[in-house]
């Protein structure tokens, strides 16, 4: 479990949204409260978030973005190629990290063990220490509330931040909307 962050991704009817809290913890100390752990990739057509160490995040984001470019924006192909590279590289294989990536068609959880997991519902995924809280809140809100996709992500992360001591409520989101 990564005691550093909560990232939530939601693929709704009209928008895909990723959000993350801003807390960076080191042991039992909060080092920073306004970190940004999510990114827009592929000219804003792909969103990504990271749970794990910050130094590892930059390396993995760059590696994923390069594979995304070489696959001409094909998220599925990039995710599979990324997972293969991550798994077979001696250094990267030791990283304890996870990523969420999504576009308007897919949402994937990627891990250093080679996993490429699409959520069963194809809509909601979460990682990090508050991930289960955010995931539970998002599922309940998606089923019982009529919130905009971005508000659903923000509300779910707010709930996680109120429960998980490694998650704060300084929430950042990025959105991909359907092209009109």
From Swiss-Prot:
Annotated positions binding Na(+): 161, 164, 167
InterPro entries named in the record: ATP-dep_Prtase_HsIV_su, Ntn_hydrolases_N, Proteasome_sua/b, Proteasome_suB-type
Record keywords, A-Z: Allosteric enzyme, Cytoplasm, Hydrolase, Metal-binding, Protease, Sodium, Stress response, Threonine protease
Enzyme Commission number(s) from the entry: 3.4.25.2
GO cellular component assignments: HslUV protease complex; proteasome core complex
CDD domains cross-referenced by the UniProt entry: protease_HslV
Cell location: Cytoplasm
Single Gene Ontology MF annotation: metal ion binding
Paired cysteines (S-S): none
Active site: 5
SUPFAM superfamilies: N-terminal nucleophile aminohydrolases (Ntn hydrolases)
Claim: Metal-binding is one of the keywords in the record: yes
Biological process annotations from GO: proteolysis involved in protein catabolic process
Annotated catalysed reactions: ATP-dependent cleavage of peptide bonds with broad specificity
Summary of activators and inhibitors of this protein: Allosterically activated by HslU binding.
Keyword Cytoplasm: yes
Gene3D superfamilies reported for this sequence: Glutamine Phosphoribosylpyrophosphate, subunit 1, domain 1 (3.60.20.10)
Record family assignment: Belongs to the peptidase T1B family. HslV subfamily.
Subunit structure and binding partners: A double ring-shaped homohexamer of HslV is capped on each side by a ring-shaped HslU homohexamer. The assembly of the HslU/HslV complex is dependent on binding of ATP.
Name under which the protein is recorded: ATP-dependent protease subunit HslV
Organism this protein belongs to: Campylobacter jejuni subsp. jejuni serotype O:6 (strain 81116 / NCTC 11828)
């Amino acid at each position: 479990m990564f005691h550093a962050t909560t990232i939530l991704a939601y693929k709704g009817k009209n928008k895909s949204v990723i959000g993350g809290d801003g807390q960076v913890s080191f042991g039992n100390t909060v080092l920073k409260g306004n970190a940004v752990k999510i990114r827009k990739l592929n000219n804003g057509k792909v969103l990504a978030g990271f749970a794990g160490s910050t130094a590892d995040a930059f390396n993995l984001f760059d590696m994923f973005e390069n594979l995304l470019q070489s696959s001409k924006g094909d998220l599925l192909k990039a995710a599979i190629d990324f997972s293969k590279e991550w798994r077979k590289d001696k250094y990267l294989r030791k990283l304890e990290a996870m990523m969420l990536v999504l576009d308007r068609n897919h949402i994937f959880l990627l891990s250093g063990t080679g996993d490429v997991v699409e959520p069963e519902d194809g809509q909601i995924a979460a990682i990090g220490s508050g991930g289960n809280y955010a995931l539970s809140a998002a599922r309940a809100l998606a089923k019982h509330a009529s919130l905009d996709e971005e508000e659903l992500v923000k509300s779910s992360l707010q709930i996680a931040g109120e429960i998980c001591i490694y998650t704060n409520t300084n929430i950042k989101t990025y959105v991909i909307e359907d092209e009109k």
